[in-house]
Swiss-Prot record:
Coiled coil: none annotated. It is an enzyme of class 4 (lyase). Belongs to the RuBisCO large chain family. Type I subfamily. This is Ribulose bisphosphate carboxylase large chain 2. The active site is at residues 168, 287. Its EC number is 4.1.1.39. It catalyses: 2 (2R)-3-phosphoglycerate + 2 H(+) = D-ribulose 1,5-bisphosphate + CO2 + H2O; D-ribulose 1,5-bisphosphate + O2 = 2-phosphoglycolate + (2R)-3-phosphoglycerate + 2 H(+). The basic functional RuBisCO is composed of a large chain homodimer in a 'head-to-tail' conformation. In form I RuBisCO this homodimer is arranged in a barrel-like tetramer with the small subunits forming a tetrameric 'cap' on each end of the 'barrel'. Heterohexadecamer of 8 large chains and 8 small chains. The keyword Membrane does not apply.
Amino acid sequence: MAVKTYNAGVKDYRNTYWEPDYSVKDTDILAVFKITPQAGVDREEAAAAVAAESSTGTWTTVWTDLLTDLDYYKGRAYRIEDVPGDDTCFYAFIAYPIDLFEEGSVVNVFTSLVGNVFGFKAVRALRLEDVRFPIAYVKTCGGPPHGIQVERDIMNKYGRPLLGCTIKPKLGLSAKNYGRACYEGLRGGLDFTKDDENVNSQPFMRWRQRFDFVMEAIQKAEAETGERKGHYLNVTAPTPEEMYKRAEYAKEIGAPIIMHDYITGGFCANTGLANWCRDNGMLLHIHRAMHAVLDRNPHHGIHFRVLTKILRLSGGDHLHSGTVVGKLEGDREATLGWIDIMRDRFIKEDRSRGIFFDQDWGSMPGVMPVASGGIHVWHMPALVTIFGDDSVLQFGGGTLGHPWGNAAGAAANRVALEACVEARNRGVAIEKEGKAVLTEAAKHSPELKIAMETWKEIKFEFDTVDKLDVAHK
């Protein structure tokens, strides 16, 4: 009689991948998914299916399961929670053994956690809400090339947020006119100017010419002001080889900082560029273009707090974070949550900010959040309150739209920033008393006075689409 070694056929996922009594290990990578199951699929089966498809499972029993220690390598759904106010979906907590993932590879992590499982028929919608990376995995990743303190030392700027501006119009300027716009902003008081995310090397402005004219602007502004200046030179390119070519040229001409679009450019390219920046003493600004395709739908995709953690592991010294008060999507408490994720060494679970797990970053440097998108001088008190000193406040139209020109717009923002910081340091509640603080400063700054008059009626009062589920236990 033949020996039967395994039971062929399809089994319920819950039989193998649902373990409500599992004790989480310090070395496990933990994930929480918001799952909207198909009709007729119960919660335990849906959670187990996600655990299986994002780890070792397939749709049927296979004999090769006997050739490995499946019980060690599998993902385990270990807890289910209600989503407050929405009975169509639920939270599933899943633990993955660290050995499922290649060391230092955010590419490999995402290939499992947000790979084929997102097309799985057992679920109608699936969203990765948060991930806990154990310190054992964090230490395998390079992280930010330099971090906040090293950037302050390189740029010789302390005690306040840094001030930036994205050059507009974002497309269409010649390289010479682009450099002129940078110079006017930098001499007016900005610390940085910036390429926009889609400025690469187009027919109207090739990258090398842009780099040359921008560096001329930086050097001239530094000579006039006595301050260190910079411009985020976007090295995002069609191929990694071309990206490194542009980065090398930026280093050759003396640029202190370059820029990369980490989602459209790719996580592999970003990690490589971060390593290059670390080795070559170059700061790295990260733009999040395409993030809203992934994170804005509250039921399907990847929450931005996860994209933030992935970026900190992959590497970047700056990351766009939204503004709360500007034109772009961003719930206040959720934004404060991912700002903490960027900067702090240890973040406690805080459901009021959407943080599901403790996260220990060890000695990994922090990332400076960048507030950008539809902001102007009237927003300065709120921005300084929300973001604090270790941030970049970046005004594009709020600088270049000044009736007196770029330099005046930069001067208005610099005066507003320093007035808010000085008032805050005296104990003034600047978010409440901001109007009085700015009005007093404007008595000595005609540039600020005109800026306040120009933008006094400009507000972006659309409701946030992706709101926190506030009634967590």
